[in-house]
């Protein structure tokens, strides 16, 4: 599972997920999976989508993951009264804005990449679209 090796602070405030994304172009591979909606991806969701793609292309080609879960999410245990401080870190998320290219793929035919990204998109909680590299 993806998570930072070390952080400056253990816990962060919730905050908001506004604005537009950086990393909106396909830069490493030939094809990409781009976010249309906004939301947050857990490390488990990122890994599940990666596995779905890898299995479908039968480990040919190359896959890049362009998102990293760097925000800790805390939860208090069940049946615990409110107060007594912030809960423990339970999982890590990556905040996704519209336009962010989340995964890229290279070295496979377009139809195979399309199907692999479709399977991966089923594992993710946000709407996505298939994009190709723009050649100038």
From Swiss-Prot:
CDD domains: Ribosomal_L16_L10e. The keyword Mitochondrion does not apply. GO terms for biological process: translation. One of its GO terms (molecular function) is structural constituent of ribosome. GO terms for cellular component: cytosolic large ribosomal subunit. The keyword Cell cycle does not apply. Keywords: Ribonucleoprotein, Ribosomal protein, RNA-binding, rRNA-binding, tRNA-binding. It comes from the Bacteria. It holds the Pfam family Ribosomal_L16. Belongs to the universal ribosomal protein uL16 family. Binds 23S rRNA and is also seen to make contacts with the A and possibly P site tRNAs. Part of the 50S ribosomal subunit. This is Large ribosomal subunit protein uL16. It comes from Aliivibrio salmonicida (strain LFI1238).
